[in-house]
A protein has these predicted regions:
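Active-site phosphate/pyrophosphate-handling residues
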Residues: 76, 149, 185
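Residue-level signal for pocket-adjacent positions within structured domains
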Residues: 14, 138-141, 163, 185-186
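C-terminal binding/interaction regions
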Residues: 179, 183
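Glycine-rich beta-strand-to-loop/alpha-helix junction loops that act as flexible
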Residues: 131, 163-168, 184-188
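Conserved N-terminal beta1-alpha1 strand-loop-helix module at the mouth
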Residues: 1-93, 100-128, 153, 159-160, ...
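Flexible, gly/pro- and Lys/Arg-enriched active-site loops
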Residues: 90-96, 134-157
Length: 211
């Protein structure tokens, strides 16, 4: 396995819409200081050159804190900058093709909403799964909340680790206690905090208490 359950405990997913007066680099560093265990760089608007530059800078930053950086969707960019891996959705590149491009030692995470998708992703070589949206989410308007029983069934249907995704924050994360997850993937629950470092630390304490 290319990633441990411990590295999936509190997984930060970047979102440029929360930047305000800060740079993404500054926000990510605050999250790292607060204790995030994995960072996913997700960009939907940058051109390839800017995305590559940002990826290289964040990779160096994350490695300074001994935290892996993975890239959302863009397998070619992940390979180019030697990122630690990728996260791909059901409509993105096939897992076996991503593995061929990246090599055996890179992290491949996959979104899985159903037991069938979870089992198929594990069989194809995924290292971990992201399942949800457990509480709905502002980052994807069409993401309806998943029944927590179904989320738990997804976790129990595979041997690889599963993280909860979707609308998770310090106010609701304790509702996930006992659901067999490895950790949580969080966007606004980290980056929308007025004090990102403090908010991250408080969220990490809650996540650690339920897994």
């Amino acid at each position: 396995m290319n990633i441990t359950r411990e590295q999936l405990k509190l997984y930060a997913v970047t979102d440029r819409s929360w930047l305000g007066s800060e740079t993404l680099y500054e926000q990510v560093e605050k999250a790292l200081k607060g204790g995030v265990t994995l960072v996913q760089l997700r960009e939907k608007t940058l051109d390839e050159a800017a995305f590559e530059k940002e990826g290289q800078e964040l990779l160096e930053l994350c490695h300074h804190y001994n935290v892996p950086l993975i890239i959302n969707d863009n397998v070619e960019l992940a390979k180019k900058i030697h990122a630690d891996g990728v996260h791909i959705g059901q409509s993105d590149m096939e897992i076996k093709n991503a593995r061929e491009l990246l090599g055996a030692d890179k992290i491949i995470g996959v979104t899985a909403k159903t037991i069938e998708q979870a089992k198929a992703a594990e069989a194809a070589g995924a290292d971990y799964l992201g399942s949800g949206a457990v509480f709905g989410t502002s980052t994807k308007a069409d993401a309806k909340p998943m029944e927590l029983e179904l989320f738990q069934e997804n976790c129990e249907s595979v041997t690889i680790p599963v993280v909860a995704i979707g609308g998770i924050n310090a106010d609701n994360v304790l509702l996930l206690k006992g659901r067999k997850m490895a950790g949580t993937a969080v966007v606004s629950g980290i980056f929308a905090c007025e004090d990102i470092e403090k908010g991250t630390r408080e969220l990490l304490e809650k996540v650690a208490s339920i897994i």
